[in-house]
Amino acid sequence: MAQLVLFDKARVAAWVAQEVGQGADWGSYYAMGVERDGQMIAGVVINNFNGANATAHIAIKRFTKAIIPLFQAVCDYAFNQCKLKRLTGMVPSNEPHIIAFDKHIGFEEEFIMKDGAPGADMHVLVMWPDKCRWLRKE
């Protein structure tokens, strides 16, 4: 059975880094994930906090219903606990399936950085708290 991993940020972050090819240190970050049978199958790292914005990095190896509470926990942390005004995702244009997935979960295209990624443009995506379907409505 899949379960949330909310309090082992180093383990989740190491797995996400491997999955997304992150070679650099995350800096100040928080991470949450989903594991099944002791193996990570999904994770989100949030870093580059500046008080209003942070960057989200998402890795999913296997889809499960536990992805829903993961996104709820991530958005609750970002928007309710950290009081961020936005979450930012950056995806190279040569990864159209990732852009489509991010839009499916609620990110919107904000702009495209010409030559912002090695060999590609960089899509800058944003999730706004007032449009976030993962937040529980009061």
Regions found by a protein language model. Give the residues of each.
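A short helix-loop-beta-strand connector motif used in the catalytic cores of GNAT acetyltransferases and
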Residues: 21-33, 54
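Conserved acetyl-CoA binding element of GNAT-fold acetyltransferases
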Residues: 50-62
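Conserved GNAT acetyl-CoA-binding A-motif
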Residues: 80-91
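Conserved beta-strand in the GNAT
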Residues: 39-47
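Short amphipathic alpha-helix that is part of the acyltransferase structural core
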Residues: 1-22
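Conserved catalytic-core motifs of GNAT/GCN5-like acyltransferases
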Residues: 90, 108-123
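Conserved active-site alpha-helix within GNAT-family acetyltransferase domains
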Residues: 94-111
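C-terminal "cap" of GNAT-fold acetyltransferases
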Residues: 116-138
